[in-house]
Amino acid sequence: MFRSIRDMLMTKSSLRALRHRDFAMVELAGWSAAAGFWFYRIGLQVLTWELTHSGAWLGIIAVAESIPLFLLLPVGGTLADRFDRLILARLIQLAVIIVTAALAVVTILGWITPLVLVVLAVAHGVTGAFWMPVRLAMVPNLVPRDDLGAAVALHATLFNLARFLGPALAAPILAVWGVGPAFAVGAACYIPFFIVLFLIKLNNTDARAEAGRKMLDHIREGFVYAFSHAALKYLFVIILVSAVFGRAYMDLLAGISEVVFSRDPKEGVAI
């Protein structure tokens, strides 16, 4: 009975993509990694505010993390098309673990300064610029074409669920143990996903075909393709506007929660 119910759910909804072992492992372990990102993100804001009590420094840290994302995302997308995505994923996730663990260590040992935060934020931004296109490009290599729509929908759902629950999970750890342990927990959250990357295989990609092309030509063709389609062009504009004018509030929440609402920054940022 339960098997028939499960089969029905798998067939008639986006959950059917979980029939594929490797995709299911990546998504479930990837949720842990996504939650770890929010431990880092919330902790970074709180720590910046505790060190400086400056809205300007909150902005500096946000810019330090965003500039690599803006500049290197096209390069990351090109690498995801030209090289083995699984190897890239392993290397990038290892770098993320190292950066987050380093942030935990320097915070716990009391070595943290605003300048150290800037350096580590830049490093994390670099990993994010390479990870985002690899993460998205891996999904089509984990399921057959018939289940691709369901896989993309489920991937987006779980990713946004982590965006909602990650800060809520980080808040009690920040409140009870502090920022350093929160970073340590965040680094640990990446480990299950890192292990899973050695247990899966990706379907064949076109990496070899793309490897012979010049990287700059590949990037230019990507921009031409994106802006030659009206739907994609307007979508990029919407994303750019929301990133420029909407993200600022998220990056300043630690200061806003204390200055405007007289709340502990840990509570305000988590909310």
Where are these regions (language model features)?
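Alpha-helical transmembrane-bundle signature of multi-pass membrane transport and export proteins
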Residues: 1-271
